[in-house]
Amino acid sequence: MSSKSHLPYAIRATNHPNPLTSKLFSIAEEKKTNVTVSADVTTSAELLDLADRLGPYIAVLKTHIDILTDLTPSTLSSLQSLATKHNFLIFEDRKFIDIGNTVQKQYHGGALRISEWAHIINCAILPGEGIVEALAQTTKSPDFKDANQRGLLILAEMTSKGSLATGEYTARSVEYARKYKGFVMGFVSTRALSEVLPEQKEESEDFVVFTTGVNLSDKGDKLGQQYQTPGSAVGRGADFIIAGRGIYKADDPVEAVQRYREEGWKAYEKRVGL
């Protein structure tokens, strides 16, 4: 696990140099939750309803805003209001993957205006280092607001069967994160990555690990998704667990998110010795 993963969120929040990461750990500590809900719904009403009902129990709400069939500016302003009301961060799972000039326009501009409302974004590094550099540069634009409350996760590994995000790809993900650590918060991965390229690691390094595919009941789906439990994910180094269908498709999503919160927090306390 990361050199800091044995420490409580409160300590990591206090010592972390990245303002957004510090805020994220503070939210987790205050709300006693490490749950990220992946709200993969297709209407604004469903998204806002989930955000309002589940908001008190989560640290982060993950969106795929481009699958909404009725997206309007009102949807985004309402989502921001709910994030403030319930104290959670918004993670737009856009998975940027293009040349630098294009991703800059996709992030800061275009129809979705992602930089204006999403605290966290992510990217794949198949295009090379330039995609990370370009996204980091965008936050330095004169018209970019709230730059210290924006951050990037690099998609270093995936939980789908047969994923090619392994080996050299994962190593380069860690290398680029270290180079652009002012904007890169950490990784979406199946484990902590602190032992990748250990010769480059600084003692103060503290990247956040988000792990997808967390589900209390299913082993996987027909499309190659492979699940792990909150306990196994946190045990492998996840700081924040991402759960989707196991929560929003449950008969009672509020009851479900509380179970994930309880299991995730129990695993976290075991890891840090509380």
From Swiss-Prot:
What are its GO cellular component terms? Answer: cytosol
Q: What class of enzyme is it?
A: lyase
Active site, per annotation? K95
Q: In which pathway does it act?
A: Pyrimidine metabolism; UMP biosynthesis via de novo pathway; UMP from orotate: step 2/2
EC number of the protein: 4.1.1.23
List the keywords (alphabetical): Decarboxylase, Lyase, Pyrimidine biosynthesis
Q: Which GO terms describe its biological process?
A: 'de novo' pyrimidine nucleobase biosynthetic process; 'de novo' UMP biosynthetic process; sporocarp development involved in sexual reproduction
| NCBIfam families reported in the protein's UniProt record | pyrF
Q: What is this protein called?
A: Orotidine 5'-phosphate decarboxylase
Q: Which gene encodes it?
A: pyrG
